[in-house]
């Protein structure tokens, strides 16, 4: 908090996790895997089994970063289900913490989980599991700003160790970050947050996306195409496999 910026990146498999772990403080197995890997239009279709299988793979690639797993839609609707599913995820995937979307509406659930020693990361602003229709930024109008600040302070009081702020207007994100002692991790929420998170596939240029907050830091799709093109060409020309690559 208020020191070195926190780096958070997503991973859905061992290979990606191994590379992400070299740079990330937090590796997030996000329910964004629904759109990235399965072409779902919404994260609501992601199941607990989806999250757990990918998380098990990710765990094998992590050595140093904190591993956080998104709890998918409808897996924490009440205290009983939330605790049962959270324990299952942590026990079977060996993750370090789970992430839930929401503030005041799920305060009793968060309180119950933390009381039972479940480490929780919060998520405020745009809540993908609750969105119907177009995604819109949050915190522009006074009432939203007030509620987001209130929810942030509430989550801090409940004991979450960090809060993701998604698509939160700049001045609101700055105010929240300055008003609480736990770290804020921004995604489309300005440079003023204590850290930043992006979907790794997006920032590496693997996905075609026009989301405003996504900056492409590499063009991995181009590199992949070049490699596959060379592979095909060498097979056609009978250059591969040469003696070096044959038994």
Q: What role is predicted for each listed range?
A:
Residues 1-218, 222-247:
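Alpha/beta enzyme core
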């Amino acid at each position: 908090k208020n020191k070195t910026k926190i780096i958070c990146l997503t991973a859905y498999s061992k290979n990606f996790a191994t590379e992400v772990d070299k740079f990330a403080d937090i590796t997030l197995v996000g329910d964004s895997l629904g759109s990235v890997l399965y072409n779902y239009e919404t994260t609501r279709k992601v199941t607990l089994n989806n999250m757990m299988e990918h998380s098990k793979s990710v765990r094998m690639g992590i050595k140093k970063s904190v591993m956080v797993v998104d709890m998918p839609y409808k897996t924490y609707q009440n205290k009983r289900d939330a605790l049962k599913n959270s324990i299952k995820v942590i026990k079977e995937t060996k993750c370090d913490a789970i992430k839930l979307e929401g503030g005041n509406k799920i305060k009793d659930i968060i309180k119950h989980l933390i009381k039972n020693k479940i480490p929780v990361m919060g998520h405020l602003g745009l809540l993908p599991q609750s969105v119907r229709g177009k995604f819109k930024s949050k915190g522009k109008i006074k009432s939203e700003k007030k509620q987001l600040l209130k929810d942030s302070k509430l989550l801090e009081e409940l004991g979450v160790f960090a809060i993701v702020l998604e698509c939160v207007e700049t001045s609101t994100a700055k105010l929240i970050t300055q008003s609480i002692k736990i770290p804020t991790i921004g995604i489309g929420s300005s440079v003023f947050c204590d850290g930043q998170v992006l979907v790794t596939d997006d920032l590496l240029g693997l996905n075609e996306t026009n989301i405003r907050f996504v900056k492409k830091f590499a063009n991995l799709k181009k590199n992949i195409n070049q490699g596959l093109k060379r592979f095909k060409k060498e097979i056609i020309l009978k250059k591969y496999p040469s003696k070096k690559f044959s038994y």
